[in-house]
Amino acid sequence: SGISVIRVGAATEIEMIEKRHRIEDALEAVKSAQAEGVLPGGGSFLVQKSANMLEFLADKVENETQELGVKIIQGAVKEPLKQMCLNAGESPDIIVHDVGLQEKNFGYDFSEHKMVDLLERGVIDPARVTRCALQNSVSVAGTLITSNFAIVEV
């Protein structure tokens, strides 16, 4: 019938709210995956695609400023994987380089310290989430570049 009920228990109201939010996030991730599919997770998809991003966008890049923008994005999309490396005590430069050379769907498994097929292992990201994150970050960067200033909280 397409309907399910998830019952969750918790010792405190705060714990129950936290669990409810986690379930809602998981449900939204499943809906996103159903709508637009999944990508290999762990930051590997964007790292692998960044290598030929300038070639792919060659017909859309009209000047040096736009080319610089693409190069900035090429570097920025590697940051999530670099941060995961740092969190795991691994060398970001080596792993990011190696992930960039891997076949489709492959990435680094931090628990086993080796390259694996991420889709096979269930390490996935909803394509919609990745697309929206990239679009939103480019939009914010564009706004900052064109406004020439920003007020930030440190």
Residue ranges and their predicted role:
Residues G2-V154:
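Extended, low-charge hydrophobic alpha-helical regions
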